[in-house]
Amino acid sequence: MGKAKAERRLKDNEAQAVARTIRVSPQKLNLVAALIRGKKVDRALAELEFSRKRIAGTVKKTLESAIANAENNHDLDVDSLIVAEAFVGKSIVMKRFHARGRGRASRVEKPFAHLTIVVREVEAKGEAA
């Protein structure tokens, strides 16, 4: 139950994409999200392409989805997009048991995370008026 979740309102020059229940810890996902925050989308895609982190492929796919949403749903110019926000949230934690010595067992927690990427269209600086 509880109260209804307040949706974040996007501005007219923004678009977003969300990846839910990604099988990685939020801390590890946040390391990759920090790589692309505030960068132009083409630069961010290049960084994700050559990143050695396992989860970089999922982040790249989510960023490409945000770019496609900006182009197709919001009619924004792809060449002037930046990654305005890339934030990570906790999701479920799967609990599993790991057999130990002497007939004992210990709990292993397998965390999941949510990723939200917001891209924003910025005006080119130095345009002649």
UniProtKB/Swiss-Prot annotation:
Disulfide cross-links: none
Alphabetized InterPro entries for the sequence: Ribosomal_uL22 (IPR001063), Ribosomal_uL22_bac/chlpt-type (IPR005727), Ribosomal_uL22_bac/org-type (IPR047867), Ribosomal_uL22_CS (IPR018260), Ribosomal_uL22_sf (IPR036394)
Keywords on record: Ribonucleoprotein, Ribosomal protein, RNA-binding, rRNA-binding
GO (cellular component) term, any one: cytosolic large ribosomal subunit
Any one GO molecular function term: rRNA binding
Subunit structure, as described in the record: Part of the 50S ribosomal subunit.
Family classification: Belongs to the universal ribosomal protein uL22 family.
PANTHER family (alphabetical): CHLOROPLAST 50S RIBOSOMAL PROTEIN L22-RELATED, LARGE RIBOSOMAL SUBUNIT PROTEIN UL22M
Name listed for the protein in its UniProt record: Large ribosomal subunit protein uL22
Species for this entry: Rhizobium meliloti (strain 1021) (Ensifer meliloti)
Origin organism lineage: Bacteria, Pseudomonadati, Pseudomonadota, Alphaproteobacteria, Hyphomicrobiales
Gene label: rplV
